[in-house]
C-alpha cells in the first residue's frame, strides 16, 4: 500500500483528539497569564530585552525537575553541565563579527501547567532571547503558548506534535489528520506523532505472531482521561488504515478512572473477550505509571499473560522497570534515544555511546532516553544562532529555528522536510520528525555502557521505522 495511506480515513480522529488536548492546555495557559497579573506587557518585555547585555545571549530552559513528571528531567543537571562545557557555551559564539557569551537559566515546572506558565513569564521578564522546553504536554504546551503570546522564540520536544500544534490559536487538524490552519510564528518542535506509535508497535506484533502461536486479539487498557480517550477513539482505526490486512480485533477494557486499584473485571474481559471467547494475546495501553504497575501485578496474579505487551507512556525509564521487577521481562515500548545509535553530538562530536557512558560513569545512575532529546534542544539552538545576523532579533531567530536541518545526538532533524513519506515529512514548517524504534526490557545491560551493569535494560528489538538503529536484542514473548 502507498505511504500516503497513513493519512486516510479515521486516523484523523486520533490526531484531532491529541490536538484538542493541546488546545485545552493552551487555553488554560492563556487563562493563567490573564488571571495571575504577573505577566509582563509587551512594553515590559521589550524593556527587559533592551536591558539585556548586547554581548550576551540568554537562553531559558524549562522542564519538570520535580513532581509526577520528574523522571523525564532526571538527567537534566548532567546534560546541561556537559552543554556548558562545549565550545560555543564555554567560549562564546561569533555572529556578525561579535562574540556573544551564552547564559542558560533553568526553571522547574514542578510538573504543573500553571507553574510552567509562571516560570516562563519570569524568563520572558528577564529578557531571554530563546526558551527551550521538554517533557510532556503538561510542560511543553503552557511554555510554548506563553512564548508565542509574547513573541519569544521557543523550541519544544517530547510531546506528540498533534498535541503541541493544538495549543496555538488558529491551528487546526485537517480531515486527513495533518496540520492545518495558522501555526505559530515563534515556535518550533521535534519529536513524533500518532502514526509513529502505531508504526513502532505493530511490526513487533507481526514478529511475535511469526514466532509463537499468537492470535490477533488486542487488549486495550485506555483510561478515562485525555490520552486514554484519544487512543480509544482512534488507535484501532489508525492500525486499520496503516495495516489493513492485519485482521486485528480490539477489545476495550473500559474507560476506567485514573488511580483505580482493582482491575479484576478488566482482566477477565481480556482473558475471555476475544474472538470465540479467546484471550487477548496482544496488549496495548496508555496509563499512568502507577496504574500500569497495579494492573500488571494483578494480571499476573489472575493468570492473564498476553504474548506481547506494547505500552505507551509507561516503561520509558529504568525506574518503571525496577518497580515491577520480574514482571518487566520483555514488556515492549517505543524509544527515541539509545547509546547504540550511530549518532553523535553536533557540538563536540561525542558519540551517543560515550554520552551515555559518561552519565553512568559519573554516578548519575542508568542512562535514560530523555537525555538525548534534551541535548538536542541545545544543538538546535546553536544551529539557528549560527544562521542569524542578530541573535536579539526574535523574529529572525524564530524563523531560523523553523528551518534548522542538521544531524546530531538524536539523529537527523529537519524542521521543514518535504517528503512523500509521512513518517519523515514535517507536518508543518517548524516541526521535525524523529523516528522511534521498538525496545523490550530485559535482564542485564547491553554491552555494559560505561562498564556499569544494571539489572534491567532496554534492548532494541525492532527498527522498522529507523533502520539506522542497530538491533541488539531479539523480540521475545512478554513474561516468558
Residue ranges of model-derived segments:
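N-terminal secretory signal peptides
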Residues: 1-22, 32-36
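Twin-arginine (Tat) signal peptide motif
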Residues: 18-27, 45-49
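C-terminal segment of N-terminal export signals and the immediately downstream linker at the start
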Residues: 40-62
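Beta-alpha junction/loop-to-helix N-cap segments that form part of ligand/metal-binding clefts
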Residues: 51, 71-78, 89-176, 193, ...
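Extracytoplasmic "Venus flytrap"
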Residues: 60-83, 107-113, 135-136, 223-230, ...
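Extracytoplasmic ligand/sensor domains, especially the bilobed periplasmic-binding protein
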Residues: 129-255, 307-333
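Segments of small-molecule ligand-sensing domains
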Residues: 358-371, 382-451
